[in-house]
């Protein structure tokens, strides 16, 4: 999914935090219009910094996103919104097109 995004038109102005420390990511996150990623600490940090977050919920319960209106979620295909659990294990069922579509809605 990440490689599809990086190679898309939307991905040309994005980069991954995979080799950065949390502290190194803070100024980048704060200056973003939108955070896109799975339900991890970086998404929650983005929300704490008042940045909209599109969180990919592969196997995270809805309660992890319900605390802020800045969070929009994408669930695996075939899973009803808000019905993911720790046992969903849906990372291979997340639609790139759905993530891209939701991303474009949130930045426009």
Feature map (PLM): residue ranges:
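Nucleotide-sugar donor-binding patch of glycosyltransferase catalytic domains
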Residues: 44-107
């Amino acid at each position: 999914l990440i490689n599809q995004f990086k190679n898309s038109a939307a991905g040309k102005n994005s980069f991954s935090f995979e080799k950065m420390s949390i502290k190194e990511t803070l100024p980048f996150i704060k200056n973003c219009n939108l955070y896109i990623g799975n339900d991890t600490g970086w998404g929650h940090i983005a929300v704490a910094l008042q940045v909209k977050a599109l969180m990919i919920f592969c196997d995270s319960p809805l309660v992890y996103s319900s605390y802020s209106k800045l969070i929009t979620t994408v669930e695996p295909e075939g899973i009803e919104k808000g019905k993911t659990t720790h046992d969903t294990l849906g990372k291979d069922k997340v639609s790139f097109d759905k993530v891209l579509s939701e991303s474009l809605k949130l930045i426009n």
